[in-house]
Amino acid sequence: MTVSSTVQPLKACVPEATEAADMPHHTLSKSMTFANLDQYQYWHAVGPMLGRMLSNGSYSIHKQYEYLCLFAHVIIPKLGPFPGGRDIYKCLLGGTGSVELSQNVQKLGLTARVAFEPTSYIASTGVDPLNRHTVHATLVELRAIGSASIDMELHQMLVNELTLTDREERLMSPEAISGTAWKTQILLALDLGQTGITIKEYFYPALKASVTGQSVAKLCFSAIRKVDKQGRFEPASKAIETYMKTQSQTDLYFLSCDLVDPAATRIKLYLMELDMRLAKVEEHWTMGGKLNDEETLLGLKMLQELWVEFGIIEGMRNEPERPSLPGDPDTIVPFIMNYEMSPGEALPKPKFYFPLVGIPELKIANVLTAFFERYGMPEQAAVYRNNLQTPSKDLVIATDHQAWLSFSYTKKKGPYLTMYYH
């Protein structure tokens, strides 16, 4: 979700094949050079889809070129080796290698997003096996460009609270490091707004929790209180902390914040739930009945509708040991929730993440088209399925492109959805 940017009305068509030669990605490819084959592969594997998202989101032609150039010159060099059967560092994201595209959908229109884990070849050679040493340089470079608005203070305060220090990394044996399924500790996400970029940082404290013997929840709440000297987040944070103490089988998963002035940021706390039942979703959405206002309950009604229409299969899930892959069944992935805290707000706002891997693409598109029609989003209903079509995807049989769907609701903005593409 963008903090300050505005979005424009949707474009009611997808460029035809005859127009592909005029699209910015194709034009830039004629004169774009790269330092190595990995960067070339990322550009041609991910760039075309990013280009379509910008075009379909009615970005100005100038913004399309600006953001594609940013992707090529700033982001791609920070993605490390391109995946392809080699024994390389594996990112937590389920997109292509170290990058994942997503798109915010709301009544006002579409916003493209790029999430990635800054990395380099040294994460694969053993020099930086836990990939700790690329993110800071990436943030400095992003701050230097004119497109992005970024405040480094929260990064500087949170990085040692939620990720391994040098001393803590030395406590891990080489065998423990190599045997760790998830090594990701930080991700970045860029909301590509119509007027500029907002940057979010995601902290995954599981490694630090393991080394220090603390729970992820304890690390997160402690970190929030250390950076929140004015107590702006204390009421909402305390409400979440109290609720999480009732969940004996569920810990927090990760924390995110907007890299803006700490007084204006939002902080989100995420949990991963293996109990894949609608009753458990309802419990988390309302925080056991603590969130019972009209807005929250109307959002829950919409969530329940989507749950039924997607045909989510209920039951216990296993904790995933890898990102989802094409061909995985629709019973492999648990669900994720987050609680968004805003300065001065007494209670958080819930957001739910539907795992969609294994569900046919056409079914997902049809469910969302009908949802948009029901809730006053006719432009989205008119174009969603067409925007999804690509020459390489048959929506009737594909089951791996639309991987996750987040959902939240407020009276002010209405339904707010983000589709994560793999």
Curated annotation (Swiss-Prot):
Its EC number is 2.5.1.-. CDD domains: PT-DMATS_CymD. Disruption phenotype: Leads to a drastic reduction of both roquefortine C and meleagrin synthesis. Accumulates high lebels of HTD. Disulfide bonds: none annotated. Induction: Expression is decreased in presence of phenylacetic acid (PAA). It comes from the Eukaryota. Pathway: Alkaloid biosynthesis. The keyword Metal-binding does not apply. GO terms for biological process: alkaloid metabolic process. The indole alkaloid meleagrin was shown to be a good candidate to control c-Met-dependent breast cancer proliferation, migration and invasion. GO terms for molecular function: prenyltransferase activity. Keywords: Prenyltransferase, Transferase. Substrate binds at residues 100, 204. Dimethylallyl diphosphate binds at residues 113, 200, 202, 268, 270, 353, 416, 420. It is an enzyme of class 2 (transferase). The keyword Transmembrane helix does not apply. InterPro entries: Aro_prenylTrfase, Aro_prenylTrfase_DMATS, DMATS-type_fun. Belongs to the tryptophan dimethylallyltransferase family. Roquefortine prenyltransferase; part of the gene cluster that mediates the biosynthesis of the mycotoxins roquefortine C and meleagrin. The first stage is catalyzed by the dipeptide synthase roqA which condenses histidine and tryptophan to produce histidyltryptophanyldiketopiperazine (HTD). HTD is then converted to roquefortine C through two possible pathways. In the first pathway, prenyltransferase roqD transforms HTD to the intermediate roquefortine D, which is in turn converted to roquefortine C by the cytochrome P450 monooxygenase roqR. This is Roquefortine prenyltransferase roqD. It comes from Penicillium rubens (strain ATCC 28089 / DSM 1075 / NRRL 1951 / Wisconsin 54-1255).
